[in-house]
C-alpha cells in the first residue's frame, strides 16, 4: 500500500516540493548545461602512428543538436514553465508563501509569522500549490 498525501503519492509530493525549492537555481543549471554541451571534453589521440579519422559533421552542429535534444534541459524547462504558470496565477499570499517557504527555505512556523497567516492556512496554501503543480505537470 502506497502512502498518499494531497491525493498524490508521497514520493510525487516530495519530488514536486524539491523542484519548487530548486526553481531559483534553474537559470544557473541551464547555463551550466549549455556551457557543458557547447564545450565538451574531447579525448586526445594518444595512438602514436595510428590513423586519424575525421568526422563528417560539424562540431558546432553536433553541439547545438546535443543541447537542443538534451533530456535534462527539457525537464528543467518543463518544470520551470509549470512553476512560473503557478506563480503567475497565484494570489499575493500564495506568492509570498512560495517565496518564503520554498525559495528562501524558511520553516513553516516562521513563514506563518512573517506573512501573517495561521498554521492551518499555510497547510491549505501548500496543498493547493502542490495540487496545482501536479495538475500542471500531469502527475497522477
Swiss-Prot record:
Does Transcription appear among the keywords? Answer: yes
**InterPro entries recorded:** RinA
Keywords of this entry: Activator, DNA-binding, Transcription, Transcription regulation
GO molecular-function terms, A-Z: DNA binding
The domain of life is Viruses
Function in brief: Activates int gene expression, probably by direct DNA-binding. Int activation requires both rinA and rinB.
Q: Which NCBIfam families match?
A: phage_rinA
Name assigned to this protein: Transcriptional activator rinA
Q: Taxonomic lineage per UniProt?
A: Viruses, Duplodnaviria, Heunggongvirae, Uroviricota, Caudoviricetes
Amino acid at each position: 500500500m502506497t502512502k498518499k498525501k494531497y491525493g498524490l503519492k508521497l514520493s510525487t509530493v516530495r519530488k514536486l516540493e524539491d523542484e519548487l525549492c530548486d526553481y531559483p537555481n534553474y537559470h544557473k543549471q541551464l547555463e551550466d548545461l549549455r556551457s557543458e554541451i557547447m564545450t565538451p571534453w574531447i579525448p586526445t589521440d594518444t595512438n602514436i602512428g595510428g590513423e586519424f579519422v575525421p568526422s563528417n559533421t560539424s562540431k558546432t552542429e553536433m553541439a547545438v543538436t546535443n543541447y537542443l535534444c538534451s533530456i535534462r534541459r527539457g525537464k528543467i524547462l518543463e518544470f520551470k514553465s509549470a512553476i512560473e504558470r503557478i506563480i503567475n496565477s497565484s494570489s499575493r499570499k500564495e506568492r509570498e508563501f512560495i517565496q518564503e517557504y520554498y525559495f528562501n527555505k524558511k520553516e513553516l512556523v516562521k513563514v506563518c509569522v512573517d506573512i501573517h497567516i495561521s498554521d492551518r492556512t499555510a497547510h491549505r496554501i501548500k496543498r493547493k500549490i502542490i495540487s496545482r503543480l501536479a495538475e500542471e505537470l500531469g502527475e497522477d
